[in-house]
Every structure is written in structure tokens, then in C-alpha cells.
Amino acid sequence: ALGHTAEDLVTTFFMNILQSGRVEGMLPRAEYFGGEFELVRPLLMVEKKSIAAACRQWGLPIWTNPCPSASTSRRADIRAWMEQLWSHDKESRRKTYNALIRWQLDFKR
């Protein structure tokens, strides 16, 4: 299981559009190697702020990405762009998540 969040889903979606011209995100569940390996992302439709609130409530540690390039990557640039867009219209964050969640739930492989 991986800890990708709703923000990761949106970031990956925009990265795929801008870098490869593909309309694609991440699936909550994906099979690899002919179904021998299954990857799940149980937090894919949960916002980071909700995860952080739960961690605080349960006394769990909250950590940031330790990767040295985490703040200087293309992914970081896309996240900053999204935050800028969302800062002008608070509902746009929810609408973006909801649109991608509906797309993910409707998407069948």
C-alpha cells in the first residue's frame, strides 16, 4: 500500500497532461505482472489536511517528504501552480478533487 493523497492524484493528473499529453491520473488499485502484484492507494481520495488532523488526534507523527529534490522538482512546481489557482477560489480545490474522483471511479481498465 502507498500513501498517495488527493493532492498527489491531482498533481499527477496535471503532470501527465503537461509533460506527456495524456489524460491520466493514478488508480486507487492497480495490478501488475499479470495480476501477481497488486498496488493499493487507500488514501488517494483523502486530502492531506484530513490525514494530518487524524494524525494529530491519534498522536501519530507527521513528516514531510525527506527527498532532497522534493521542493525543487516539476511536481513541486505543479503543486505551487495548483495552490495559486485554488487560492483565488476556495471551491475550485473541492471541484478539482471531485472531478478527478468521479473520473477515477468511472474509469475501468
Pin down the residues of each PLM region.
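Cys/His-rich short segments
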Residues: 109
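Active-site adenylate/phosphate-handling loop in enzymes that bind or generate adenylated species
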Residues: 1-50
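Generic structural signal for secondary-structure transition and capping sites
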Residues: 22-23, 60, 90, 105
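Mid-to-C-terminal catalytic subdomains of enzymes
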Residues: 3-7, 47-93, 97-98
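C-terminal-of-GTPase-core extension/linker across diverse P-loop GTPases
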Residues: 100-104
